[in-house]
Design a protein with these regions (language model features):
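Sec-dependent signal peptide recognition
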Residues: 2-11
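C-terminal motif of bacterial Sec signal peptides marking the signal peptidase cleavage site
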Residues: 16-17
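Surface-exposed binding/hinge segments that line
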Residues: 22, 77, 181-203
């Protein structure tokens, strides 16, 4: 039994040694799909709309969550380490698409990404994330959002309205191999409007 294990281990190591790491060191070619995305915007101009500040409803009531209490107790001891276990081995590092909805997803998306606004755990009202402030227009079933001009991606590039327009292209495209997301973003929203680099509405 022990001899068989040794032979199997040795064979595995030999096979691994025969492989070439040439493919592992080659980076995938970068793809500039700007033309494709812009063409999609034009083809779906009824969804990807453009406006100006003058087009905003005059009676919007803006909110920013400034009246909400601090999250957690000020007496709580900050810092420390929490140890948890994963229910299964990560099937993928994708956040959308095949096998992306596993128990590892909260660690790379749900619990780590920043949304436009987040729910306060006590009051359940919203406080800012990437949004500076927001307003709801019930007549048009739209949410108007002013993005925080200080918000950036991890590389320091500012987050703008174009990023949110691209988000809707991304979730509607068949490239992601995620029919549920395709259906949701095509059926539950009627459009996104860009008023400026930091002002959008989602309907």
């Amino acid at each position: 039994m022990t001899m068989n294990r040794f032979a199997l281990t040795l064979t595995t190591l030999l096979l691994m040694g025969c492989g070439s790491d040439k493919d592992a060191t080659q980076a995938l070619p970068s793809v500039d799909n700007t033309a494709e995305v812009l063409a999609f915007y034009e083809t779906h101009a009824d969804f990807f709309r453009a406006g100006s500040i003058d087009d905003l409803p005059e009676d919007l009531v803006w909110e920013d969550g400034a009246d909400l209490p601090e999250v957690g107790s000020p007496k709580a001891k900050k810092g420390g380490t929490e140890y948890v276990r994963l229910a299964d081995f990560p099937r993928t590092l994708r956040t959308v698409g095949p096998d992306s909805n596993g128990s590892f997803r909260p660690w790379i998306l749900d619990d780590t990404s920043m949304a436009l606004a987040h729910r306060h755990p006590e009051t359940l009202d919203y406080f800012p994330g990437l949004a500076l402030r927001w307003a709801v227009d019930t007549d048009s079933k739209s949410v108007f959002v002013e993005l925080d001009p200080k918000a950036t991606w991890s590389d320091g590039v500012p987050i703008t309205a174009d990023d949110y327009r691209f988000t809707f292209w991304f979730f509607r495209t068949r490239y992601i191999t995620a029919p549920w997301y395709n259906n949701w973003y095509e059926s539950q929203y009627t459009g996104i409007t860009k008023y400026s680099d930091h002002l959008i509405s989602i309907s």
